[in-house]
UniProtKB/Swiss-Prot annotation:
Cofactor(s) in the UniProt record: Zn(2+)
Subcellular location, record wording: Cell inner membrane; Cytoplasm
Residues where ATP binds: 93, 111-115, 501
Encoding gene per record: secA
GO cellular component assignments: cell envelope Sec protein transport complex; cytosol; plasma membrane
Source organism per UniProt: Helicobacter pylori (strain G27)
SUPFAM superfamilies: Helical scaffold and wing domains of SecA, P-loop containing nucleoside triphosphate hydrolases, Pre-protein crosslinking domain of SecA
Protein name: Protein translocase subunit SecA
Family: Belongs to the SecA family.
Molecular function terms, GO-annotated: ATP binding; metal ion binding; protein-exporting ATPase activity
Function recorded in the entry: Part of the Sec protein translocase complex. Interacts with the SecYEG preprotein conducting channel. Has a central role in coupling the hydrolysis of ATP to the transfer of proteins into and across the cell membrane, serving as an ATP-driven molecular motor driving the stepwise translocation of polypeptide chains across the membrane.
Length: 865
């Protein structure tokens, strides 16, 4: 209350920002007459001068220079837009452009021209000469926006590219990323970053820098999708568990008797009776013994799949596959899979083919990907409700931009009914009334299931209508465009065609504009506001109203008993409703509870990913160093050799390596032969003084002698690629270990320990082990490289060429848990640890390892072991 009073007296923080930006608008407008008089060539030359000025400035001072040239850049961009696109930026759009340039979020209502606003900040920041990324939620919007704005950018001397899922060729992607301005989806940008850090050549990396990104529909990408990490994964070399058996057990269990459901936290809690029943059905004595860990995990996932996840709400079944429905957008998330075996549990539940589990090869959250950018900004129609999260997680302020024309839409109070049936009956009556009048109506539902229910009711009443949900997603833009036609009735899940305007004729405006009916409050107020925002664009008339019932999930799970109490006291008859500010406030409080739960969940995910992110950055930085032809790889190998020998000698008699027993010397001799391919006699070891120096010089001379056959460039290239393979293999195994650690870490809470603290501690120790493993594995592998003195280096070149070609053109499935081809797994295992004695020999002789290279030493050839 006090804050509101102070805001009215001295103005809010937002008001003060807008006031400052308006001063800049005056400066930009003052330049307009001069630029209007210029010819096209003169205008283009003026912009080229700005480029020269910015690019001639020291990198650290370029941001300051951008602010200095902002008025000229914005004025030229606006004049160019008038000539090329026949659109002039309004003053409020200039403010939006300045907000974006300042690295903030511009909250602009539907129809205010966010696509055009972005051109101001994009054109300004591209002056620096680094690619600017414009991020959208889907391929359709990325392609549409880039094509619409490309003529303007070309006039200003910029090149434009669009990254979509259909661009499969690596060279084509590389060419697109070389453009000044790149449009694309958040998934494509994120996956390209991960793929870049699996490349074996710096030249083949597509993302050269992360200077500036504008995220369109920023709330959808940075909030709604923040809980789903981007993952590139490969098949697990482990036996598949019986998901069908776990599904049978789960289906035989009874709610309340065998388990309870915590709907607020979406969790299943198994009772003692349930544990006994499961043990009996699985045929085990103790479900929670270490050897039954997989069974208990699969049962947990099967219970979730059967009792917390519902078809046509959380997922659909299409083409013998379980496809996720995004809970926030209502769109199908094709290719994305639930992790930790939940997706396989859903496949077992629905009786479709079960796909194997996968192992993470590379992953990152959207939070940590977008936080890499030197400057990040965003646009959306709904951001204020999540302003705290944007500031806390991304350090992004939200600025509400005034509309160009006043909003005329009427937002009516919610109507609350006792039952869902009564609510839908009332909705049908209202739709019929509006349809008969000719006023278009857009009906929002929270799930596919509810939209299908409404569809059946309208069909029964013979009211013509169109349904837009994840099952009809291919027609999304077309359906939404037609939602403003006379008499149109459109049922939509919360996907509701973001980014597509519903334009109205004068006749429709006379009828009252687009009427919005919400059939249920979403868990997030922001999603409700998005639905309202479909109506009343650019000063158009419109109306919005929500119809609720006590049986709606939000009110049933999170709602206050006060609402039910009010309904009972009033003694409402069937079909009657209440309309009260008290009830509306209670609904909003319930939404705030859920929003806070989701915020904590996203923050929790980020806290864990921040730990992995530091490790990821360290590994990727080292990877880039290895890819650099100027990197001194020989020094790194020498360092590893010294480390490996220190490890070996530390296990012998402490500080007394000169008085080793014959048994210890024999053990040292065998280790040197098996691990380092160094043939040293027992007599030489006995005579060596000091022994550490003798062994070190022996290993070094052996290695240098066999590498003489290669010229320096070829040697460096081979050493770097082999080291990269070792690093990638070790990183893959480290990620698998980290996944396992994260899965079970919450159990530490039962032991009065903070799971996050324990995770940080153990992940740090695991990372130290990972570094040690790389050093040991690297020196062992390099010690086994063999050449014949008389052979030339053609084998080496042939290997390098073949490896590069295989590695760079590996087929990849583009999805949230991407899967690499089996061939890549074979290639990446080329330099794995020494095989077990009964495994096939890696030299491909067809013999067992114990009967081949283990006995006779490495075969002659490039990388024989």
């Amino acid at each position: 209350m006090i804050k509101a009073i102070i805001g009215k007296i001295i103005g809010t923080r937002n008001d003060r920002w807008i006031k400052q930006y308006k001063k800049q608008v005056l400066a930009i407008n003052a330049l307009e007459p001069a630029y209007e008089k210029m010819s096209d060539d003169e205008l283009q030359n003026a912009f080229e001068e700005l480029k020269k000025r910015v690019r001639s400035t020291e990198k650290d001072l370029q941001e300051k220079t951008l602010l200095e040239v902002l008025p000229e850049s914005f004025a030229i961009t606006r004049e160019a837009s008038k000539r090329i696109l026949k659109m002039r930026h309004f003053d409020v759009q200039l403010i939006g452009g300045m907000v974006l340039n300042d690295g903030k979020i511009a909250e602009m209502k539907t129809g205010e021209g966010k696509t055009l606003v972005a051109t101001l900040a994009v054109a300004l920041n591209a002056l620096k000469g680094e690619s600017v990324y414009v991020v959208t939620v889907n391929d359709y919007l990325a392609h549409r926006d880039s094509k619409e704005m490309e003529p303007l950018y070309q006039f200003l001397g910029y090149s434009v590219g669009t990254i979509t899922a259909s661009v499969r060729d690596d060279d084509e992607r590389l060419e697109i990323y070389s453009k000044d301005i790149v449009y694309g989806t958040n998934n494509e940008f994120g996956f390209d970053y991960l793929r870049d850090n699996m490349k074996y050549s710096l030249e083949h990396k597509v993302q050269k820098s992360h200077a500036f990104a504008i995220v369109d529909e920023v709330d959808s990408i940075l909030i709604d999708e923040a809980r789903t990490p981007l993952i590139i994964s490969g098949p697990v070399d482990r036996r598949m568990e019986n998901y069908n058996k776990a599904d049978e057990v789960a289906k035989s269990m009874q709610v309340e008797t065998d388990f309870t459901i915590d709907e607020k936290n979406r969790a299943i809690l198994i009772t003692e009776e349930g544990i006994k029943k499961a043990e009996n059905l699985f045929g085990v004595d103790n479900l929670y013994k270490i050897e039954n860990a997989a069974l208990s995990h699969h049962l947990d996932q099967a219970l979730k799949a059967n009792y917390l996840f519902f078809i046509d709400k959380d997922y659909i079944v299409a083409n013998n596959e379980v496809v996720i429905v995004d809970e926030f957008t209502g769109r199908l998330s094709e290719g994305r899979r639930f992790s930790e075996g939940l997706h396989q549990a859903l496949e077992a539940k629905e009786g479709v083919s079960i796909k194997e589990e996968s192992q993470t090869l590379a992953d990152i959250t959207f939070q940590n990907y977008f936080r890499m950018f030197s400057k990040l900004s965003g646009m959306t129609g709904t951001a204020q409700t999540e302003a705290t999260e944007f500031l806390e997680i991304y350090n992004l302020e939200v600025v509400s931009i005034p509309t160009n024309l006043a909003i005329k839409r009427k937002d009516l109070n919610d109507l609350i009914y006792k039952s869902e049936k009564e609510k839908f009956d009332a909705v049908i009556l209202k739709i019929k009334e509006l349809h008969d009048k000719g006023q278009p109506v857009l009906v929002g539902t929270a799930s596919i299931e509810k939209s299908e229910t409404l569809h059946a009711l309208l069909k029964k009443e013979r009211i013509p209508h169109t349904v837009l949900n994840a099952k009809q997603h291919t027609k999304e833009a077309e359906i939404i465009k037609d939602a403003g036609l006379k008499g149109a009735v459109t049922i939509a899940t919360n996907m509701a065609g973001r980014g597509v305007d519903i334009k109205l004729t004068d006749e429709i405006k006379e009828l009252g504009g687009l009427y919005i009916i919400g059939t249920e409050r979403h868990e997030s107020r922001r999603i409700d506001n998005q639905l309202r925002g479909r109506s009343g664009r650019q000063g158009d008339p419109g109306t919005s109203q929500f119809y609720l019932s006590l049986e709606d999930n939000l009110l049933r799970i999170f709602g206050s008993d006060r609402i039910k109490g009010v309904m009972e006291k009033l003694g409402l008859k069937d079909g009657e409703h209440i309309e009260s500010k008290l009830v509306t406030r209670a609904v909003e409080n319930a939404q705030k509870k859920v929003e806070n739960l989701h915020f904590e969940s996203r923050k929790h995910l980020l806290e864990y990913d921040d730990v992995a992110n530091e490790q990821r950055k360290s590994v990727y930085k080292f990877r880039d160093e290895l890819l650099d032809v100027n990197y001194d790889i020989s020094a790194k190998i020498a360092e590893n050799r010294e480390y490996a020998l220190n490890q070996i000698f530390s296990k012998l008699k402490a500080f007394d390596h000169q008085n080793l027993s014959e048994e210890e010397l024999l053990g040292l001799k065998n280790v040197l032969k098996e691990d380092f391919n160094a043939h040293v006699s027992l007599e030489d070891l006995k005579k060596a003084t000091p022994i550490e120096k003798f062994v070190a010089e022996k290993l070094k001379s052996d290695y240098e002698n066999k590498m003489k056959v290669l010229d320096s460039e070829q040697r460096s290239r081979i050493e770097r690629i082999v080291y990269l393979q070792i690093l990638d293999n070790a990183w893959r195994e480290h990620l698998y270990t980290m996944d396992n650690l994260k899965t079970g870490i919450n159990l530490r809470g039962y032991n009065q320990k903070d799971p996050l603290v324990e995770y940080k501690k153990e992940s740090y120790n695991l990372f130290l082990e990972f570094i040690e493993d790389i050093k040991m594995e690297a020196i062992k592998t390099f010690s086994k490289i063999q050449f014949e003195n008389e052979q030339d280096s053609s084998d080496a070149e042939r290997y390098l060429d073949n490896f590069s070609e295989e590695r760079e053109h590996e087929s990849v499935t583009y999805r949230h848990e991407e899967t690499l081809d089996e061939d890549l797994n074979v290639a990446m295992k080329a330099f794995s640890k020494t095989p077990k004695r009964n495994e096939p020999c890696p030299c491909q002789s067809g013999k067992k390892y114990k009967d081949c290279c283990a006995k006779s030493g490495p075969k002659k050839g490039l990388f024989a072991k």
